[in-house]
Amino acid sequence: PAMWSSAEFWMQRLKKDTRVKDGTWVCPNEWSPEHGPTEDGVAHAQQLVRANLQICRDAINELSAAELGLTPADVEQLDNYLDHIDTGLHTEAYDGTTWKQQADQRNIKKGDLLLREWKYSDFTRGQGPNHRHMSHLMCLFPLNQVRPGDGGYYDAAVRSLRFRGDVATGWSMGWKANLWARAKDGDHARVILNNALRHSTTYGVDEGQGGIYYNLYDSHAPFQIDGNFGMCSGIAQMLLQSQDNIIEILPALPSVWKNGHVTGLKAVGNFTVDITWVNGKPTATRIVSHKGAPLVVKSDKDLTTVYVHVGQKNLEVVPTATQGAYELKDVPAGATVEIEFTKPAGLGALKAAAPAASKAVYDLSGRRVSESAHGLQIVGGHKVLR
């Protein structure tokens, strides 16, 4: 009810674009907190309202309109707004002159595309290249509206993040750590983490002295719990992401975190994930499926070549259309999946050959071989390593 009431409010409040006249629904008289002019169609509002409408549609797909007490007319209205709402995703080219010193330092060149913060006003209406608010990047985090290969919006969002710099305090540090993790730049996310762990030198209201106090409370200043929660989330995002219903292992691992182990990370689909890594590469991953949802795992290693199992049972691993992502088939609720990156596929189920075995021995092509031959063979219908 709360989700639908929110959607109804916005479907009544949205208006047709009267400036560009592109047929889209825009949020009227909005602001990009806490930054710049007030106007229709601001990216921050558009991205949030679009997400609200989409979440309602997802709930209908999952539970059915009838179960939610909605009529076919309600669903038709929602679909119409979803089809025509301004996405809040527009780009503009850097002009090569505004805030040029910071642009040069941050590798922003003339003609580079930035994500627009305002639909009608350009980036120069902002309050400078170091403003700590990143309101037009809701699409990157916490939402999931841009991704690599989407026609340039993801790259423009990451470039806008880089152009804004690392100056931040409190919750803004937490947000930037998450944004850089979503940008798959673990080293930059760690820079923000280091800044957040710098000791604050004031207990008054001085936003230029952000960091932490001796009790590890976040200093905005003063204390602000959002910074603590945000940095914890950012660390989790460096180690695991699942926003596309794909569990991605170590997506933004800082290069200096060479060896490590983490337990209890949660992933979309009600999974709990433990990861061990050595020299920046995963060596073992343990995934508990609490719901029995489809399980897709992304890794920089071909999962069809490593040992993936539930107990002693090998799992079928099938490549998906997403590069580097593999579906692990038929994982029931309550099962614990083990991925052992240092073992070849199937080895865990092999049986030791009996010393006096006299059964016929075959290679994996079905050709009979000598009983004294070595390697992976078939003996008595079982795979055997001799």
Model-identified regions with their sequence ranges:
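Active-site core of glycosidic bond-cleaving carbohydrate-active enzymes
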Residues: 1, 43-50, 54-62, 70-246, ...
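Beta-strand segments within the central parallel beta-sheet cores of soluble alpha/beta enzyme folds
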Residues: 1-5, 22-30, 156, 191-195, ...
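Acidic/histidine-rich catalytic neighborhood
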Residues: 5-63
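Short, surface-exposed recognition loops and adjoining beta-strand edges that mediate ligand/DNA contacts
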Residues: 14-34, 95-106, 216-217, 249-262
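Flexible loop/turn segments at secondary-structure boundaries
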Residues: 17-20, 33-36, 179, 185-186, ...
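Non-catalytic C-terminal accessory modules of carbohydrate-active enzymes
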Residues: 187-343
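C-terminal outer-membrane/trafficking sorting elements
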Residues: 308-322, 338, 343-386
